């Protein structure tokens, strides 16, 4: 094996990067890149760069570096190595190139709290600063399904309509996630890119709206279905739940969460998962009360 590691000042081969990510996901059961990173790869986002490891003509490892919109000189980094090239120093070589090319603060995600990730972070002086938990629950055959959906007075739920609801959703999303480092900075372009993905289904993108003004979005539950692969069945996801701050305390968040879970159960999914920050005690209490249990953790390391 002769692996070459090369830094690039752009994303010159998006299709190969997405294919590499899929190989890693199939082997690990978890995606190595976030949805936002995949959006940035496919769109060729300005400022996004990468380090690529190749064995001949084959892409066998890569790190993607994306500048954060709301933090000057801070970069999100995600790295993966093809299953057949692991434990051979490829990740260390990629990280060495990253250290030389990134001038600023690095926030590197390790999808799965693995010993190899911890060793690599320690080697390059990164400190764990954030735990993102994955929770799961069974819905197929569960006695509590369908969950009770108790909406505040004057509110109803309808599906998202492409071409109608983008701006209203962006408004409530930015308000609901004003303090969230990823979700709150989604742009119209990011949303439209997701609308073009094969997994996007507006029927599972639930909006809570005013009965008097159905274009006024008060909250939402965006669900997602991960297709099955091999022996692994399809998996539902509570992709994002948000409520306008004016509606907090009304029970709308719980009602939307329950409605989305019911939708996924009706679609025939056996399990539903979600991500939540470990220090978000209010959200943890809600999800645990709805039957979710801890399953997996992603760790952010910072320089």
Curated annotation (Swiss-Prot):
CDD domains attached to this UniProt entry: NAT_SF
Gene Ontology biological process terms, A to Z: mycothiol biosynthetic process
Q: Which residues bind acetyl-CoA 2?
A: 241-243, 248-254
Name the enzyme's class.
transferase
Tell me the Gene3D superfamilies matching this sequence. Answer: 3.40.630.30
Q: What Pfam families does UniProt report for this protein, alphabetically? A: Acetyltransf_1
Reaction(s) this enzyme catalyzes, per UniProt? 1D-myo-inositol 2-(L-cysteinylamino)-2-deoxy-alpha-D-glucopyranoside + acetyl-CoA = mycothiol + CoA + H(+)
Which key words tag this protein in UniProt?
A: Acyltransferase, Repeat, Transferase
The entry's 1D-myo-inositol 2-(L-cysteinylamino)-2-deoxy-alpha-D-glucopyranoside-binding residues are: 35, 182, 224, 237, 275
Q: Which residues form the N-acetyltransferase domain?
A: 3-152, 155-303
Which Gene Ontology MF annotations are present?
A: mycothiol synthase activity
Amino acids binding acetyl-CoA 1: 79-81
Enzyme Commission number(s) from the entry: 2.3.1.189
Q: How does it assemble?
A: Monomer.
* Entries under PANTHER family matching the protein: N-ACETYLTRANSFERASE
Stated family: Belongs to the acetyltransferase family. MshD subfamily.
Give a short account of what the protein does: Catalyzes the transfer of acetyl from acetyl-CoA to desacetylmycothiol (Cys-GlcN-Ins) to form mycothiol.
Protein name (database record): Mycothiol acetyltransferase
Source organism phylogeny: Bacteria, Bacillati, Actinomycetota, Actinomycetes, Micrococcales
